[in-house]
Amino acid sequence: IRDSYILVPGEAPQSATDTLVSLAKSMGFGTIKYCTQQKHDRMIAYTSQIPHVLACAYVMSPRCDEHSGFSAGSYRDVSRVARINAELWADLFLANREELADETEELVRNIERIRAAVAKNDRAELVALLSSAREKKEKFG
């Protein structure tokens, strides 16, 4: 398994943590990451919940009704996780509401920076923003 096993030990005894680490290794997890509950919740908001927020917001556009024949890989890639179990994800979002609200604000700020550059016809700023995003993706995956 290439994926990581995330362990939030909290106040668990070391023996319990050791047992979970052994289990994760026996299952073939490639990496075992330790973190606090707060770090876990922040990273889940960023890595899992924000993509669902983005996909759902994206397909809520009236253009979604008309996309057939115009869309290809980009549409499919961004919208895939909008096929959501609404009951489950509403509970997950609300259980992590503070972290998700903060991450959503960050996403909106970044979208606004791109929107402003487009609206101002500011090619230099747009290239800088897009280049910065590409560099981050290349560096961090």
Predicted feature descriptions by range:
Residues 135-141:
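Short, charge-rich amphipathic alpha-helical segments embedded
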Residues 46, 114-115, 140:
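A generic membrane alpha-helix/interface feature
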